[in-house]
Amino acid sequence: MQKCPNRKRMGDQSPRRSTGSATVMSAVLRALSICAPAALLDIPPTLAQALEPTALAADIPAQPLPQALEALGRQTGLQFVYVSGVVQDQRSHAVSAGLGANKALTRMLEGTGLKFEYLTPHNIRILAAVVVPLQEPTKKAPSDEELQEVIVTANRREQNLQNVPMTIQVLTGETLAKLNATTFDDFVKYLPAVTAHGVGPSQSNIYVRGLATGASGVQSSGVTGGFPNVAVYLDEQSAQLPNRNLDIYAADLDRIEILEGPQGTLFGAGAEAGVVRYITNKPKLDVTEAMVNAGYATTAHGDQSSNLDATLNLPLIADQLAVRAVIYNERRGGYINNLPATFARAPTDLGIATYFNHNVPANSVSINNFNIAANHFNPVTYTGLRAEALYRLDQDWSALLVQSYQNMEADGVFAEMAANSLGEPQPDLSAQLFNPSYDKDKFENTALTINGRVGALKLVYAGAYLVRNVEQVQDYTNYARGGYAVYYQCAGPTLARVQCFTPSATWHDRERNTHQSHELRVSTPADWRVRGIGGLFYENYQIQEQVDWFYLTALPDFNPIGPPTGYYAVNGSPFQQNGTLAMFSTPGAVFVPAPATSNNPNIRPLGDAFFDDITRGYKQKAAYASVDFEVVPQTLTLTAGTRYSSTNTSEVGSAVGSETCELTYNPAPPNPCLNRSAINLNAEELDRTFSGFKSRANLSWKVNEDFLLYYTWSQGFRAGGFNRTPFPAGSNSPLAPNGEPGQAQADKHGGYVTPLAFAPDSLTNNELGWKTMWMDRRLQWNGAIYQEDWNRTQIGAYGFVIAEGVTLNGGNYRVHGVETSGVARVTSGLTIETGAAWNHSELVKQGTYLWADGTPINFGALKLPNPSGPLGSPLAGAPPFQGNVRARYELAIYGCESFAQVNAVHQAHSLATTYRLEPDLQGGSTAYDLPGFTTFDAALGAGKDAWLVQVYGENLTDTRAQLYANYTQWYKGVTVSRPRTIGLRLSYKFSGR
């Protein structure tokens, strides 16, 4: 034993010491460290408090002890000294944010047989214990067979997933790589209780727990559709749009979190049913990293695909400044064939049948698509980059700046035609389009996040600015099968001498979205018995959309349409149809010069029969707070939170048409097409503010370290909005009667009037859940039972008669469900993961729809399209069962870390929409039943050192899963899963200091 000649003298000295002298303190500690056996060195509580550095700002997961000590040092500024052989084979326990350094280090070392001692206030030695003091039995150190802990930020602070009392599904970056998932369509199938309805990449609505009613067409949805009830976040920035999900390419992501149930307290409007959060990897201050992934794949019945992404992490100033960047490109080959076809008018066309007694006028023009017919005509390409810079001012303050860019370009369509517009069956994976179609979707996002501390409180500022531009062109030739096409495409001096010109038609949508958000939040340390988080939030959305429908035959002397220059008013009030036609005015109407707000003030080209030019504004101001109180410390916790928000929505612009052109056309003055209908939305003064509280309460019981029970009551909401045209009384509404006796009732009551505005809907959730670990943390089983009540549901309806999309407030729905998920480390190499959800939804209260005279509509007695369906009807996108299972076996073969995995996914049948009795061109209901399906994926691979190679197969049975069906392009289009795909993926990773 080493002797210490000064020890007795030190013990004889007066206990008085200088409280402010780090030098004296360091000398004392050095003496103790040299002379005292490590096992006898216990720092007094007062000294430990004096030496306690900054509390942890983030959780540190269980991992090899050297890496855990390194992570602790980065957060606290402590330096650790140890002999590598002492710690190299040890694993740490996980520690939570908010703990002080001493408590965190003590927790890390539990069960390892190691102790620590202070050399100086900021230098600590780790060494083997010589004497084990009397204490509770040490816990078993984590082993390689234990399941890895997952850290999430669902409560706006870093926590172990198993300690968060809510249903959360997490796909880590490692999991995404194992699943070879890079886009939303790749990973959504592995999320029980999550579905999506859409017509192609970046053209979907996301639904959680079956809270869906269906969607209208993507054209004009930006300004006429309700906002999604599931929020999409890129780090701290929300980025959802109606019918157009932000399909962020999953390169260099830390994880994707799916928070289920209302998240209105911490995430606000739009998070009514849940949140999908893309969390990016952040720059590392102490390591240089480089990663490259390359892949090639071939799709059955389709073209080849390829992808390449590269990531670089580079410290610029040691422990202070680092940058991280990722760049990616992926081209996915098409698999839909545009078949050669000829389009000729038919006696069954609604317009031909109505006006010409099923006789096609002589000399009517036919067209073909021979010049654009092609196989595999729907490729999609993702190109993008993300650059991040992290600057740490000191141990308390840091700033993160992120710049993201992505460009997605898709050709063709992603929905096969089950039958063409005449109802004739079509081959698998085929369509018949007569004009080029494409979708271009680009976004840029700049975000700044500042983290800091003031005393014990943690402060976070998060600000971001998103710009998203969409340009889409789609073939619309099948519109000629409808009832109104003859008004625009057929003309003659008399009905007997009418000629129908080309049926070729397209629509062109240009949408620009800007979103600015700012949030300031403050939180207490996570280990306080009473802890809280609160904040202020502001966001400003603006959606500018122009949609032009080109289906008008431009005959001599036709006058092109343009934005309205004013509106008609009666006694100073804007007339309902406030256009530029005298026919839409009433006696005493006066024209008021007042140009509508225009994104494009120009006269439209000839052939443009109808256009929208609308700007939609959406502003939210909110304040929120949530408090946790440990009724029984570390055992029973009560949480209560609320959010007050004021949401303003507005709309300006115009909807302009040329429907006053007549079948009988005389080029001599007066030309009927000099007139137009023009709705000046500025005159409607479309501006509403919705405000109120939405709250959340939770009681969680930590039965033991591995068993959490909780009950949650929570509320969510979604703001209201406007329909682009308040329909006048008559048959032009999407709810228009389609036959007797509905037509007679419509005539009796003055027709149906589409509401000018739709109100917010709301969701209330009651949930009982559990999170458990078993078998020495080799088995995880989580689950929840819930009831959700969705009231005044916003329903998107598509008017087949005149192709008009509107949003209505429908009835009340109730959803009962059960979810469960499990992970089992069966052996050291075999891991099985599974998830399942059972859902039952029904309409419990019918919505109220009124005739123009205010009389309620009785859908049960009339042949009318009911947006909600009859009582007891299920929601759309709500399969009664969803489930998946994934098995992965890892083993070492010839020095390589090899693996094999297989995945299976099953989804039961569901409906595409709640809409009922609206006819389609093939007859029957548009509430299409989507059959259930099962798909299988598999992968084999091996890695050595920095290299990894894998071969994978997706949809191995080449199942044609029907994901969504719609009729918005005037034929039944069915979005199907990508056919069987076999691919090769090669990865390389470098890491150094």
Model features per residue range: what roles?
Residues 124-125, 184-187, 204-207, 220, ...:
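N-terminal periplasmic accessory domains that precede
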Residues 149-150, 309, 447-477, 708-714, ...:
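Membrane-embedded beta-barrel scaffold of Gram-negative outer-membrane proteins
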Residues 220-225, 229-260, 310, 353:
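Short acidic/polar hinge/loop motifs at secondary-structure boundaries
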Residues 301-410, 444, 512-518, 523-539, ...:
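Transmembrane beta-barrel wall of Gram-negative outer-membrane proteins
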Residues 335-376, 411-434, 475-508, 548-613, ...:
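Solvent-exposed loop segments that connect transmembrane elements
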Residues 390-394, 523-525, 531, 535-539, ...:
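Structural signature of Gram-negative outer-membrane beta-barrels, strongest in the C-terminal barrel
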Residues 532, 638, 780, 784-790, ...:
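Gram-negative outer-membrane beta-barrel transporters
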Residues 549-550, 554-556, 832, 904-917, ...:
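C-terminal beta-signal and adjacent terminal beta-strands/loops
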